[in-house]
Amino acid sequence: LEEIPDAIDRLKLITADGRNYLEGTAKRYAAIINDTFTGKDPALSLATIEALRIAKTSLLPGGIYATNVVSEQEGEDISFLRDAVTTLNEVFAHVVIIPCEDTSFGLEDNYLVLASDLAHSFSETLPYDDDFLRNVLRDSR
């Protein structure tokens, strides 16, 4: 936290509907962070292949798309994680999963999922293979 004052001049937070904002801007970003929920459920409109394609066009070359994914049933149900990773793999060349404990907010497991077209190096990633992948999330429109 001591480093935050040094980053304030470089950090710009935007509070808006993420998908609508990205659709309406020509700006490009080094990172886009998706940590959105409707109650305990993820905001599906930001997790679909259509939304991720919009986000990708808003990233600088080599930029990183980061999303927080919460499991259900005390970490037993990772179906949304599997679908989110599957969908990200359709849009980005490289997708990694990093487990994040969140004991202060309950028993659910959190995962940080990072995607980019550039291979970045991250520690403590969870390996996965094609058997882990499930369904591509799509708009219902």
Question: Which residues fall in each region the model found?
Answer:
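The AdoMet/dcAdoMet-binding core of the Class I SAM-like
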Residues: L1-A66, E74-L81, N89-V91, G106
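Alpha-helical scaffold elements adjacent to nucleotide-binding pockets in ATP/GTP-utilizing enzyme cores
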Residues: D83-T87, Y111
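Soluble small-group transferase modules, centered on the S-adenosyl donor enzyme superfamily
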Residues: H94-R141
